[in-house]
Structures are given as C-alpha cells and as structure tokens.
A protein has these predicted regions:
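NAD(P)-binding Rossmann-fold cofactor-contacting core
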Residues: 13-14, 20-41
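ADP-ribose/adenylate-binding Rossmann-like module
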Residues: 77-99
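Short hydrophobic/aromatic-enriched beta-strand-loop microsegments
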Residues: 81-85, 103-110
Length: 124
C-alpha cells in the first residue's frame, strides 16, 4: 500500500516524523508531500498532493483550516485515494462532506500509527 503524507517533515520529536518513520518501517510505500522541502526520510518530496500519481491513503498533518483545500486537491487527483486520514486533533466537517460525497472514506481525529498498532495487536 502507498501512503502520501501531507505536511511531511523529518524533524526529530515531531509527530509527523515519528508516524512517517513508523509507516516506512511497517513496510508501506510512503510519499512525503510538502511545498518547501526537497527530501524527507531519504525520499523525494512532492510539492503538492496533485503531483502524486496515485496512493491508497492520504494522511494529513495540517491544521483544520487547511483540510478543505487539501480535500479539493485530492478530488483533483487523476487517481484518487480510497481514504483521507486526518491525524489526531484534526477534523473538518467541510472536508469530510466534500470527500464522502465522492466516495472517499474519511477518518478524523485519529492517529494512523496508533490505529495500525491496535489492529496488529487485535490480529495476534
């Protein structure tokens, strides 16, 4: 599975860095997205989610006021993801409505790393 992370930064101690590294170590293909960075986690950075050819999940590490704009960008993708994931502390009714109306699953206010670990534990 391929996961694009909007707001990707490899700054030690930040949640986005911990989660990105965790997903890479878990075997996911992680695509960092950030308009001002060239490389994150030793990977090429996409300046916008619209530049990503395809991914299964978009994980958002941005403040809630930016969610609707990123939802619009996701809808402009040629190959849309099946899920738009807003990290813990982030929710946006407007983004949720935009995406769900187009058949994209939306997760709000949940950490993808915590949920992944929980699912692994319940499966074992």
């Amino acid at each position: 599975q391929t996961i694009a992370i909007i707001g990707a930064k490899d700054v030690p101690g930040q949640d986005v860095d911990r989660v990105g590294r965790y997903l890479i170590e878990a075997g996911y293909r992680v695509l960092p997205v950030h308009p001002k960075r060239k490389q994150v986690w030793e990977r090429q950075v996409y300046p916008s989610i619209t530049m990503v050819d395809s991914c299964d999940i978009v994980v958002l590490f941005r403040a809630p006021q930016y969610c609707p704009g990123h939802a619009q960008e996701v809808l402009a993708m040629k190959n849309r993801p099946s899920c738009f994931w807003m990290q813990e502390g982030i929710s946006s009714p407007e983004a949720r409505t935009l995406l769900q109306d187009k058949g994209i699953a939306v997760v709000e206010d949940r950490c993808i790393m915590v949920e992944h670990r929980r699912l692994l534990q319940s499966a074992s």
